[in-house]
Regions:
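Short, well-ordered coil/turn segments that N-cap beta-strands
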Residues: 19-23, 63-68, 94-98, 136-138, ...
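N-terminal capping/small domains of soluble enzymes
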Residues: 2-90, 97-105
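N-terminal small/glycine-rich loop or linker at the start of catalytic domains
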Residues: 21-41, 94-116, 139-152, 186-187, ...
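Conserved small/polar residues in nucleotide/adenosyl-binding loops
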Residues: 303-312
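Conserved, mostly hydrophobic/aromatic
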Residues: 46, 142, 181, 223, ...
Length: 313
């Protein structure tokens, strides 16, 4: 099997992505989402302008001192910089590992609750992953979404999304890509932090059970979970120390020690909240078997306000 051939490389790549003090930059926004960011500074959403935006970002001086990997949209993976050099090459010169978003988006999950979804894109995934590997990608990302409600998430939604994440992980490992496993829990709702912790533990355990059934090589994976926070409409205020303790406790109960790194998504959190919570997690004295870091995309917005002054327009 191809997985046997790539095992050592997968482990090494996962460890590099989980380098302490560095995080993963999520720049896998779709063409439409990128267009909204460009529109905020009065720039038309064209391929040339998207190329310039990403090129500016990837050539930021010192980016590789803080970023270990970058998750790209397919257009970016096959795109060249304005100077003719590939975007992949620009990242590699900074010591940043290129990655690729491989899922095809969320679809309604028939038989589940009305709002519940599954993530599409498994058909032909290994073949696509092989093409991405040939272009220079070395890791992948797949996002499943679940929501806490009065009667959810349903067992069907948990099982289906866990199975999809595991099938994706094994499929891309067959092509040499490290899978980032992302079971996002939306912040919608008025539930407390204990409810989030209990449901998140259940979801993550189901994900790793499915990974075991599919023969996923855990040492060659990363987890990208939500932080363990109360619902956005919960009346109480989230204390960073409480969030940190709840998150680490939940993960210690559900994530195997074989996984080298956990990189958090920011979800509905502000930049300040996401940073404070992560900092508190790393200050905890608990023995954590994995490196804890970030995989945020919102920081990209910090570059846009000065884009015109930098000759972007």
């Amino acid at each position: 099997m191809a997985l046997s051939y790539y095992k050592e490389t997968l482990r090494e790549t996962a460890l590099k992505l989980a380098t302490p003090g560095k995080g993963i930059l999520a720049v896998d926004e779709s063409t439409n989402t990128c267009g909204k960011r460009l529109a905020s500074i009065g720039v038309e959403n064209t391929e040339e302008n998207r190329q310039a935006y990403r090129g500016m970002l990837f050539t930021t001086e010192g980016l590789g001192n803080y970023i270990s990997g970058a998750i790209l949209f397919e257009e970016t993976l096959f795109q060249d910089h304005a100077d003719g050099e590939s975007m992949i090459s620009k990242l590699e010169k900074e010591g940043i590992i290129p990655g690729i978003k491989v899922d095809k988006g969320l679809k309604p999950l028939v038989g589940a609750l009305e709002h519940e979804t599954y993530c599409s894109g498994l058909d032909g995934l290994t073949e696509r992953a092989s093409d991405y590997y040939a272009r220079g990608a070395r890791f992948a990302k797949w996002r499943a979404v679940l929501q806490i409600t009065a009667d959810g998430p349903s067992d069907l939604a948990i099982r289906e999304n866990a199975w999809g994440l595991a099938r994706y992980a094994r499929s891309v490992q067959e092509a040499g890509l490290v899978p980032i496993i992302e079971p996002e829990i939306l912040m919608d709702g008025d539930h407390d932090i204990l409810t989030t912790s209990e449901i998140q533990e259940k979801i993550i355990k189901e994900v790793y059970f499915a990974c075991q059934q599919n023969g996923v090589y855990l040492e060659g994976t990363l987890l990208k979970p939500s932080m363990t926070v109360p619902g956005a409409d919960y009346e109480g205020k989230s204390d960073p120390k409480n969030v940190a303790l709840a998150t680490v406790t939940t993960l210690l109960r559900s994530v195997p020690a074989a996984v080298p790194g956990i990189v958090f998504l920011s979800g509905g959190l502000s930049e300040e909240e996401a940073s404070l919570y992560l900092n508190e997690m790393n200050l905890l004295s608990a023995d954590k078997p994995w490196n804890l870091s970030f995989s945020y995309g919102r920081a990209c917005l910090l570059y846009t306000s000065d884009a015109a002054d930098e000759g972007f327009c």
